[in-house]
Design a protein with these regions (language model features):
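A short glycine-/small-residue-rich loop at the edge of a beta-strand within enzyme catalytic domains
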Residues: 54, 97, 101, 131
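C-terminal accessory module of base-excision DNA glycosylases/AP lyases that mediates lesion recognition
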Residues: 1-63, 132-196
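Catalytic DNA-binding helix-loop module of base-excision-repair DNA glycosylases/AP lyases
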Residues: 105-146
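Short, well-structured hydrophobic secondary-structure segments
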Residues: 49-89
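Helix-hairpin-helix/helix-loop-helix acidic hairpins
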Residues: 72-116
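Generic helix-packing signal
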Residues: 100, 125-126, 172
Length: 196
């Protein structure tokens, strides 16, 4: 894995981002490419077309399956997510997404749902406002100097997201925190590379 974080060459970042789909495919996880395409392309459009942005229970379950496919599968959390009341998911995510662009309030609100922590909550926010919220991933966080050991807390996410927003601003040219996160994740090789 190269030291992408410390590179100031936009081409290095672009190359890493362009490898994202290939790295997704090389994970060897059933349905991950399809889930990732849905998460990146279909879910953001569905959220954007709603009068009041929110996710449904079915979308939250599918998003959780995407997150676990790309990272670590936690069956208990998925059971908890599936057990949420459908109306509560819509109400909670509607309230949360109305708090954008606050750096952490939407994450905190979404994390009130059963089985949802800052990482899953950040996936909802990232699908809604990729210019503000990156998805919270430990393989990405490990590449950002100064963050320390990954802690699945709102405070840690706040520092992580701020660092990725700052890097996106430095890269300019339309880069978002989500682009930075995906480039760093691709640079890591994903969980398949970390398991070696």
């Amino acid at each position: 894995m190269s030291d992408l974080w410390n590179s100031t060459a936009r081409r290095n970042w672009r190359d890493a981002l362009e490898r994202y789909d290939d790295v997704i495919s090389r994970q060897g996880v059933t349905n991950l490419p399809e889930r990732d395409t849905w998460y990146r392309n279909e879910l953001p459009k569905a959220i954007a077309h709603r009068a009041k942005p929110h996710v449904t229970l079915a979308e939250l379950v599918k998003l959780t399956e995407w997150k676990m496919s790309r990272g670590e599968w936690r069956a208990r959390n998925l059971v908890l997510v599936r057990g949420n009341d459908a109306a509560a998911v819509v109400a909670t995510t509607t309230t949360a997404l109305s708090m954008i662009p606050h750096p952490t309030k939407p994450i905190s609100e979404i994390a009130k749902l059963d089985g949802v922590g800052p990482a899953t909550a950040s996936a909802v926010a990232a699908a809604t406002a990729p210019d503000v919220y990156p998805f919270f991933d430990e393989l990405v966080a490990a590449q950002v100097p100064g963050l320390g050991t990954v802690a699945w807390t709102l405070g840690y996410y706040g520092k992580y997201a701020a660092a990725l927003r700052e890097r996106a601003e430095q890269l300019g040219d339309g880069w978002t925190p989500v682009d930075v996160e995906r480039a760093l994740w691709a640079n890591s090789g994903g969980k398949a590379a970390s398991a070696r």
